């Protein structure tokens, strides 16, 4: 029996769903379940997987919910560690963030966006010879605890990344996506640039979809940002990510990046 916990925002949820899907294949579609951690998805608006993608999520059986409660109690008491340790192949409860490229190798096969009835910028992005997404994440990353652990990417990082892109693709046009677009407009002086602002309110995954339409990507230290590039329909002709993924020096960057991506 394997139980994969769904938690965090959409970026993390995608890693976790891919882990679940891989385990299903490994175990011949038997004995693998999802647990929806409402407490740890609530602050991100809940579970977004089936709203953003053509996914049918399974119902969580009551016995799985009870099993998770029991396993979490054992974890608090430090008992039967093999049942929940992240590095133990015998673990039943998989409650890490599953961020490794081995778990997402088949992501393109299982993750297809739900169509949007109407969405600004689609034609503008797809008509460009070389559209580049630039994702600036601030928002919750500015909270003291998150800033200490994650940090925010510097203006220098974005400007340097833009120079790197233009050296290879002089015709690049940059499309800036951000949860703080006013800050981006005031601080990012990028050439040939469009700041993405929707005429009507759109869910966050609208930006994820638009980012995936681009041929190049400059991402933030964010799993949401990562997926915008990884699911790129332009096959990511160039993708740049921050070498320092975390502000906390003892945390290592996750092994999720394709070899041809550039660390800066």
What are these regions (language model features)?
Residues 1-3:
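Extreme N-terminal starter segment of soluble prokaryotic enzymes
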Residues 10, 163-250, 256:
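Donor-binding and catalytic core of enzymes assembling or modifying cell-surface/extracellular glycoconjugates
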Residues 22-28, 168:
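A short, Lys/Arg-enriched amphipathic alpha-helix followed by its capping loop at the start of a domain
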Residues 29-41:
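A short beta-strand-loop structural module common to alpha/beta enzyme folds
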Residues 5-15:
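A short, glycine/small-residue-rich beta-strand->loop->alpha-helix junction that serves as a flexible
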Residues 48-57, 189-198, 252-264:
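Active-site regions of enzymes building and remodeling cell-envelope glycoconjugates
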Residues 40-164, 168-169:
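Secretory-pathway luminal glycosyltransferase catalytic domains
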Residues 15-23:
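Short amphipathic alpha-helix
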């Amino acid at each position: 029996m394997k139980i994969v916990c769904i938690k965090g925002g959409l970026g993390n949820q995608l890693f976790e769903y891919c882990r679940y899907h891989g385990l299903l294949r490994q175990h011949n579609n038997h004995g693998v379940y999802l647990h929806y951690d409402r407490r740890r998805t609530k602050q991100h608006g809940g579970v977004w997987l089936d709203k953003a993608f053509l996914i049918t999520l399974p119902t969580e059986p009551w016995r799985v919910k009870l099993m998770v409660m029991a396993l979490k109690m054992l974890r608090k008491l430090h008992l039967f560690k093999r049942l929940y340790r992240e590095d133990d192949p015998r673990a039943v409860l998989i409650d890490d963030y599953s961020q490794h490229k081995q778990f997402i190798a088949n992501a393109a096969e299982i993750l297809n966006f739900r169509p949007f009835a109407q969405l600004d910028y689609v034609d503008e992005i797809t008509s460009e010879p070389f559209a580049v997404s630039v994702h600036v994440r601030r928002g919750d990353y500015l909270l003291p605890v998150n800033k200490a652990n994650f940090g925010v990417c510097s203006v220098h990082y974005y400007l340097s990344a833009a120079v790197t892109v233009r050296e290879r693709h002089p015709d690049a046009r940059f499309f800036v996506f951000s949860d703080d677009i006013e800050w981006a407009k005031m601080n990012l002086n990028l050439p040939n640039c469009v700041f993405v602002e929707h005429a009507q309110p759109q869910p966050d995954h609208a930006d994820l979809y638009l980012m995936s339409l681009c041929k190049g990507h400059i991402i933030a230290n964010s799993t949401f940002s990562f997926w915008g590039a990884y699911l790129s329909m332009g096959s990511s002709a160039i993708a740049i990510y921050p070498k320092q993924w975390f502000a906390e020096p003892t945390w290592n960057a996750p092994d999720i990046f394709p070899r041809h991506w550039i660390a800066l």
